[in-house]
Amino acid sequence: MENQDVNANESVFDPPVGITNPPIDELLTKVSSKYALVIFAAKRARQINDYFQTVDEGVFEFVGPLVTPDVHEKPLSIALREINRDLLEHTEG
């Protein structure tokens, strides 16, 4: 019975992580340079932020988070988690 109580209390959401988790070294393997990582993450964070601002209006112009965000998690942290999980494809340009 105790096992069932523990499983019932587990969160169904991914644990939130900050800018140091995922580690920067892991993120740098996904792009060609640290500058490319900054631009890539910033663009995606802006899309996520725009999505949250327009979702109440019923406008779905932007794609929402591809990972389960925490209530107080910032768009940049969400974007970095998406990049680390290879949910986004980066193209140089």
UniProtKB/Swiss-Prot annotation:
Reactions that this protein is recorded to catalyse: RNA(n) + a ribonucleoside 5'-triphosphate = RNA(n+1) + diphosphate
EC number: 2.7.7.6
Protein's UniProt keywords contain Lipoprotein: no
GO biological process: DNA-templated transcription
Any one cellular-component term (Gene Ontology): DNA-directed RNA polymerase complex
GO molecular function, one term: DNA-directed RNA polymerase activity
Signal peptide limits: none
Protein name: DNA-directed RNA polymerase subunit omega
Species of provenance: Corynebacterium jeikeium (strain K411)
